[in-house]
Amino acid sequence: MIVRCLSAARRLHRVGGSGILLRMTLGREAMSPLQAMSSYTVDGRNVLRWDLSPEQIKRRTEELIAQTKQVYDDIGMLDIEEVTYENCLQALADVEVKYIVERTMLDFPQHVSSDKEVRAASTEADKRLSRFDIEMSMREDIFLRIVRLKETCDLGKIKPEARRYLEKSVKMGKRNGLHLPEQVQNEIKAMKKRMSELCIDFNKNLNEDDTFLVFSKAELGALPDDFIDSLEKTDDNKYKITLKYPHYFPVMKKCCIPETRRKMEMAFNTRCKEENTIILQELLPLRAKVAKLLGYSTHADFVLEMNTAKSTHHVTAFLDDLSQKLKPLGEAEREFILNLKKKECEEKGFEYDGKINAWDLHYYMTQTEELKYSVDQEILKEYFPIEVVTEGLLNIYQELLGLSFEQVTDAHVWNKSVTLYTVKDKATGEVLGQFYLDLYPREGKYNHAACFGLQPGCLLPDGSRMMSVAALVVNFSQPRAGRPSLLRHDEVRTYFHEFGHVMHQICAQTDFARFSGTNVETDFVEVPSQMLENWVWDTDSLRRLSKHYKDGSPITDDLLEKLVASRLVNTGLLTLRQIVLSKVDQSLHTNTSLDAASEYAKYCTEILGVAATPGTNMPATFGHLAGGYDGQYYGYLWSEVFSMDMFYSCFKKEGIMNPEVGMKYRNLILKPGGSLDGMDMLQNFLKREPNQKAFLMSRGLHAP
């Protein structure tokens, strides 16, 4: 997942809705107020600071707002007849960089700081800056000057990327309603501010949730000793189980006590139920109302206009068609699971209720994997200690993309467990960027897996290039005395996926911050990282990623073959669940009268064939709804069509570690960032229109 901040150039996926900001920036002539904060423009280095106190965050937020507003005001007062490319468009692009970097230092700590007061100050800064962003994005005076420039500028004399910047600026201005009457603009502005606050609060609630359940050892039946030994104990010798991934999924996959799994699933899908349900009940109608004012039928229509899918009709057809194709496979998988459950209930004396419950799904899918393919993830993870996986992952990416990584000693980081690496082009030695690895859970930390773009890789006012900086934030189990952090294979896949986003951030080399890194269409943004997941299903790559944590012995060929063969296990149910989430997202953003919990329950029954647990409200825990994937969750499946096409037609055909294909991928897919349309990049890479054949094959289906 790409987490995108409100800055349009980073587009962190948590804003009130849609990456809607025009992100008007300032003029060359009026840059002086920011010069004192702009030492990073000297050589484009990483100057991000992570030691700001709550007071400093608050003060610097107000300073940034005041200084930025002054420059906007100066730009807005330019005589409209004297607007030029240099004093308007280029000036806007130049100062955009400064604002983004300053903002990062203020709003990113809410996700990673160990200090609760710093997180709170950062969240408030994000809210304050988000309101300001909306104010600036609604500056009609600046919009009129950009429109004037487009009308008078000789577009043939400016670079294609600059022309794209100009055209998108006009387009985004209209999507902000700046062509509408002032009263309507003010109404939209007020609603956007409220939407932004609601989205920030929605995800803050999830991040700060510290719910835990207490179980006896008997209630944790069949869970491995190493997991139980890692748990915090209560005074009465019971065990605390949090709802964070490193606790939740092991329990749901391996605990043989149905009541324990039921309690965990119930708690997990009622996180923040009350407060986030209220937020959704306000947020969804606001989005719909803004879309209507802007001339769109629904919020989904509004956001899809800028994506490769283009319309709700195309998305609905794609999801319904895939659902129908997967229906027989899903039915067969459910039947197999139900038989497993019946047999186990008879053997262990549990009551058999004749159905698959939500808390049964992970458990019996894990059993299916073990029975059909003899893959025991508990044994397998002993070959994936995090240090070995990290070294192998970094080596594979370096070799594939023609890069070199070097760990920075004594790096300035936000937590002592975080590491920083510098990325260089292997052939030229040019520094392309840096990335942070933040791998372990902490209190208050962002609780999923994501890549954060922190500093855009783009041109500075003097023509030099600013290095790109990104952070990979995940939550793998903590190492402990005598035992390193051991990763399940699905965690290795997640690691590879998110690092693919990091490489997109680092390898993109654009002129404008707005197009840097992963600033592509939302239903294209997952393509590069999804494509790279294929490496963790390749035997040669897996050998490079694995070594037994005790004696360094290699993973056996037999175990490798079984793991690779298991790729299609449960693929019907797993894909149908993605369709459920995509359909819920589409429904909530096309019909605001729907109840989120009821809509989720409906699709769980109709499509997945596994009922949602009564009393839960999964959408209230669904961070994507308030994190920038609103109306766009389908993009995960949609983009797999493209990623699988690229992999099978090029990498699989030419060799997955073929450096020529790797450089072709780096140059044609990663390097352009968002300076080209996603479909154009795909056609440049494939030399043809993309098709679904490889995607359907990856799902165990035959292409027509």
From Swiss-Prot:
Listed under GO biological process in this entry are: peptide metabolic process; proteolysis
As its record notes, the protein acts as a catalyst of: Preferential cleavage in neurotensin: 10-Pro-|-Tyr-11
* Record carries keyword Transit peptide: yes
Q: What class of enzyme is it?
A: hydrolase
Indicate the residues that form the catalytic site: E498
Would the keyword Metal-binding turn up in this protein's UniProt record?
yes
The PTM N6-acetyllysine maps to: K664
Stored InterPro entries: MetalloPept_cat_dom_sf, Neurolysin/TOP_dom2, Neurolysin/TOP_N, Pept_M3A_M3B, Pept_M3A_M3B_dom
Q: Which GO terms describe its molecular function?
A: endopeptidase activity; metal ion binding; metalloendopeptidase activity
The cofactors required by this protein are: Zn(2+)
Q: Which GO CC annotations does the UniProt entry carry?
A: cytosol; mitochondrial intermembrane space; mitochondrion
Similarity annotation: Belongs to the peptidase M3 family.
Task of the protein:
Hydrolyzes oligopeptides such as neurotensin, bradykinin and dynorphin A. Acts as a regulator of cannabinoid signaling pathway by mediating degradation of hemopressin, an antagonist peptide of the cannabinoid receptor CNR1.
Entry protein name: Neurolysin, mitochondrial
Which species does the entry assign this protein to?
Answer: Sus scrofa
